[in-house]
Amino acid sequence: TCLGLDVATHFDVNLTDDDIAALDASDKPEAKFLRQAIRFVNNRGFEAYCTSIDCMAVAYAIDPSIVETFEGHVGVETKDGLTLGMTVLDARHHFVWKQLPVVHIGRKADHAKFLQLLMELVLQ
């Protein structure tokens, strides 16, 4: 399964003031680590959602209902050019590159469900 930044980095994946207060009040190492990461990105002008990009993939592994997926033929560009190193989806309905593997691709996430799981995991 491929979860792109368009799904994992979303403004709706931001913690509330109550969430931040709960992290501050916790002595769990996971909560302290997340709070430290949030401070780090906040001090650089970014929001808390920047700290949870990889967490979305872990959450999907725990509960696949968090992300809606679809299947598509996907390749990774390895030659020089504009898309070097990028994952490329062949979204055409005809002349599809059938030699490419079919991958499950994240379309959208249930951000509220994700944040609830994230907070439960770091606070328990």
Region spans (language model):
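Conformational coupling and interaction surfaces
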Residues: T1-Q124
